[in-house]
Regions:
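Conserved active-site "lid/cap" helical segment
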Residues: 1-90, 98, 156-163, 185-194, ...
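Condensing-enzyme catalytic core mediating Claisen C-C bond formation in acyl metabolism
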Residues: 1-28, 169, 200-264, 268, ...
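Conserved catalytic cysteine-centered active-site region
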Residues: 4-5, 56-114, 118-137, 141-148, ...
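Short acidic, glycine/serine/threonine-rich loops at helix termini
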Residues: 22-24, 64-65, 97, 122-127, ...
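Beta-strand segments within the central parallel beta-sheet cores of soluble alpha/beta enzyme folds
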Residues: 46-56, 81-87, 111-116, 165-172, ...
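Short glycine/threonine-rich loop-to-helix capping motif typified by GTGT followed
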Residues: 59-68, 245-249, 289-311, 378-385
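Active-site-proximal alpha-helical scaffold in enzymes
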Residues: 86-117, 146-180, 220-226, 335-359
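Extended C-terminal subregions enriched in glycine
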Residues: 255-263, 267-292, 296, 301-304, ...
Length: 389
């Protein structure tokens, strides 16, 4: 393990228990609550925060406009900055990447990144997601997050010769993990048969293969790695591109179906962190997977196993909590997914693991290094981050 105090690091994290609804809190109260907990966890005061970034999914899910401006009164002076990052479910990791760059270049000392979703406020999430596709290349195709993931799933089945049973494997594993996580929304273990027998949302995706509608919040404080509890940010990799169901009709555009963008983002993150063999250099991985197909593609795209083998490896016991390289040891997004805060939850969970503070979800830390991922929009944005102690 390399110890440096001149790199950006995670100094503090916080999250609230994920639930379907949190009626006792308004959106600003939820943001303020989780923000101050993260600042306290970092051992700082509010006056020491000189940057604020709000990570946000579609505005329609919030019930308010321009919420980042609520933070102005809490910043210490004219030289502080605030902003909003919106790349859907990847917003949290993108915002932490931006915060790390501010800290690394000396623009800020301590940047607070915060996000929250309240499932019963704002407009219909279904309506918001239905507006994310490109009408020029997708035409009248009913493309939204669920149907796009279904197309990925059928492509995966056809490419690798596997059945829809493969998509139950991550869910069974993650629900076992989520049962140990007091912050998870869904904490009841399920069997593969229960997953496969659940209602079809868009074939082959079943209801239990999809993340629930979730209220929740998370916050992260980024600063220089100057304390024993700091978790260093070793590298980020980002890949963004134009993705469409009609991509094959547009020169230079590529299909989103094969998950190759995860490989591109991972390659950049590993290079920045000086990694060459992720299977031997990582203790665990926290991937953002609101559908089970995302977890399979992420495991393979991160170089943890060959393409088409992730489900079989899971069935054989790999990637479980207690294995050599656990994936989503806290349950992952299918056990609770506040979309705006989803990537920050992955970071908060990974930070707790590296600190040895994950309670019943704790995995063995041998190398002192982990990976977190996020996916935004209809797979237009992929983020991979390497964290270390």
């Amino acid at each position: 393990m390399r110890h440096r105090d001149d790199v950006a690091a995670i100094l503090g994290v916080a999250q609230v228990p994920m639930r379907t609804r949190i009626p006792e809190m308004t959106y600003p109260v939820l943001l303020a609550t989780v923000a101050m907990r993260a600042v306290e966890d970092a051992g700082l005061t509010r006056q020491e925060i000189d940057g604020l970034l709000l990570a946000q999914a579609p505005t329609a899910t919030l019930g308010v406009d321009e919420p980042q401006y609520w933070g102005i009164a809490g910043l210490p002076g004219a030289h502080a900055f605030l902003g909003r990052v919106h790349v859907a479910a990847a917003s949290g990791l993108s915002a932490v990447r931006l915060a790390a760059s501010y800290v690394a270049c000396g623009r800020a000392k301590h940047v607070l990144v915060v996000a929250a979703d309240l499932a019963d406020e704002g407009d219909s999430l279904r309506g918001a997601l239905a507006q994310m596709h490109d009408p020029f290349t997708s035409g009248q195709a009913p493309i939204n997050a669920i149907t796009a993931a279904a197309l990925q799933s059928t492509h995966y089945m056809a490419t690798h010769g596997v059945s829809e049973r493969s998509f139950a494997s991550p869910i069974v594993k993650n629900r076992l993990n989520g049962a140990r996580n007091p912050l998870a929304q869904l904490r009841k273990p399920v069997t593969a048969e229960e997953v496969l027998d659940s209602p079809v949302l868009s074939w082959p995706i079943k209801r239990l293969e999809s993340s629930p509608r979730t209220s929740g919040a998370a916050a992260v404080v980024v600063g220089k790695a100057n304390s024993s509890r700091a978790v260093r940010i070793e590298g980020f990799g980002n890949f963004a591109g134009a993705k469409s169901i009609g991509a094959q009709m547009v020169p230079g555009w590529t299909s989103y179906l094969d998950g190759s963008d995860v490989k591109q983002a991972a390659r950049r993150a590993y290079s920045a962190a000086g990694m060459t063999n992720p299977q031997q250099e990582l203790d665990f991985v926290e991937v953002y997977a609101s559908f089970s197909i995302f977890e399979l593609l992420s495991i393979e795209g991160l170089g943890l196993c060959p393409a088409g083998e992730a489900a079989r490896r899971i069935n054989e016991g790999e990637f479980h909590r207690g294995s050599a390289l656990p994936v989503n040891a806290t349950g992952g997004a299918t056990c609770g997914n506040p979309i705006s805060a989803g990537a920050l939850v992955r970071i908060a969970d990974a930070t707790a693991q590296l600190r040895g503070e994950a309670g019943d979800c704790q995995v063995e830390i041998r190398h002192g290094r982990a990976v977190v991922t996020a996916i935004g929009g209809l797979f237009q944005t992929h983020e991979v981050g390497v964290l270390a102690i």
